[in-house]
Amino acid sequence: MTLRLELIIFLITAALCPAEPPLQIEHGERTSLRRVEEVLRPDRIRHEIGYAYTAGLSAGRIGDKHGRSECTLFEDRKPLPLPRALHASIRKVGKGRYSHWTSGTLYFSTSDNSDPRTNKRRYTLVSEQAVIDHVSRVRVDRPAVTYRIPAGTNQSITNRRLIIRNTDPSTAVIPRLSIEGWPDLSSSEGILASILKPGMTAEEKSLAIWKFLVDWRFHHYPAEQGDEVHDPVRFINVYGYGFCDDSARNTAALAQLAGLRSRVWGLSGHVVAETYYAGRWHMFDPDHEVYYRTPAGHIASVEELAANPSLITQTKTDPIGSDTRAIARLYTTTEDNSVRERKVSATHKMRLVLHPGDELVYDFQNHDKIHRTTFNDRPLPPSFGNGTLTRSLSLTDHECTMSIEWPYVILDASLQWPAHDAEPLPKFAVSLEGTNFEEIPVTRQGQVYVVRIAEWLKSKGKALYRFDLQITRDSAGSGRRQIPLKLDFQFAPRAVPRVQATGSSFQLKVESANGRALPADWDGVEIVHEWQEPITP
């Protein structure tokens, strides 16, 4: 619901060489009411006492303990009638009483005092907040620019979407957008070139790699078991999370690429990495954000820690809050520890090829789909995003086969076009390797035809980054036509540039997908930043 509408157009001079014209940024804003809905996930609901249940929340809205909650709890589509109830009343009487107590905790009962985890109803905590919707559009017609988006607020802001459009009608491009000061996340070589400096010692290199993993990932159930998340570029850009073994193996992969010997220890309950230099091994644990120095000053190895666990137990807890006595036992129970030194592939590249007319959308608020082949009964990660790539497929022949490749894990793919009864329907088939094509049915939904590839993708049981699409048309229906393709993919929000409350300086580099120089008449790309700023009373 829009309360007022304002449009502000202004020019910002980017940090370019003086000979270049100023970069134009169009900024619009409007005031609206934002509806915030958080569905209570059964895996985050716990029985408390009597009829009371607690639910973990992540939307960050103020609760009654520190103010007055403006949230309403819905059971299916009906609001429960008794908010801000006493906890004793929720426990003893129930019948839909609830209390949004803190930003992270809801106390509630169901309308009939049934178990919300098993009664097959949907519980949603809903609120409305006045916000300012901001949109900044940047048109770029040169291969490298730096520009600044001045959010101009001290409040927390919510990034909605980042959109990148290739507006050129004939040139495929590879854009690389980052925040000024970020490492190059597009390849493992780029990561190392960003975090390693000339003249670094082997220990300094090891520490830089360890610190990079500490900063750019978090601990959560991985998408797959195995090497899918053991490529540093996939680990950081696609997922951003994993277990201790995933962090350790990515440490080892980067260390190997940096010219260091590395290996991984399994401690039967934990996994850590080691690098070899100065005639000995040294342990680095990015998952627990720790390493340990000996009295002699060097970083201890796993075997040294097993022999001298007091290096671990000097503090009661480690940097992430784990009991150091329990951690020490993992090292000292040497009979079930094992070590492995092997080369891990680190070849994935974030090569975002945008064909003419392509639109790439990172939706920071969309968490509908996720890739995971294991731990399906466990909570979803606290941070992940869904994006879309929209591409217009140009059909000119009776039969055409095209490869669809994308550096983010593909969650869904679909084609949709207007239904014309007189026109013969094309046939669609897909394949992983260009052989053994499997036909995908065409369905009609109202005035459009739809081809959905999601089930085929899911049936493969692993992360997919490419597939071949074959389209066959009746000769009578041949001739040039366009059919839109939409890919849904998963991305790690931490690794995608976003507007910050204090403002952000962005760096954009664009190169031609064919490796040649961009044409002199290149029409450029458009970058759109969308974010919201809360209006406080």
Residue positions per predicted region:
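Hydrophobic h-region of N-terminal signal peptides that target proteins for export
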Residues: 10-19
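Secondary-structure boundary elements
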Residues: 148-239
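Alpha-helical and coiled-coil interaction segments, frequently adjacent to or embedded
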Residues: 281, 294-388
